[in-house]
Amino acid sequence: MKPIGTVRNDESGTWIVLEPEYIPGLEALEGFSHINVIWWFSGHDREKDRSVLRTEKPYRDGPGVMGVFATRSPLRPNPIALTAAEIIHTDQEKGLIRVTFLDAYNGTPVLDIKPYTPSLD
């Protein structure tokens, strides 16, 4: 897989910064209020993290042990994450999307962006 961009968190907010060759893919995105961002848990892309299948009580009111597929844990066989985010602004010329929040670190690779469609998501 080849990342299409990265997450940038700074004093101005949270941004998705696209690689130049993917900027044309932003066309008409401004017609949507939210996007699904698929990103890579790059800080947990280690063999030992990829072998974790169960985790202890990740949620305060959850069961004592849960399978990783029932959690948002970064420790999983394929460290892929999905976050729905509200679009604040898009800049098609610069390849930027400002969003309200992403639970990803600065520099995190972004794998894909899809419009959030309530009837499908």
Question: Where are the regions a protein language model picked out?
Answer:
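Glycine-rich, low-complexity intrinsically disordered segments
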Residues: M1-A84, I88-D121
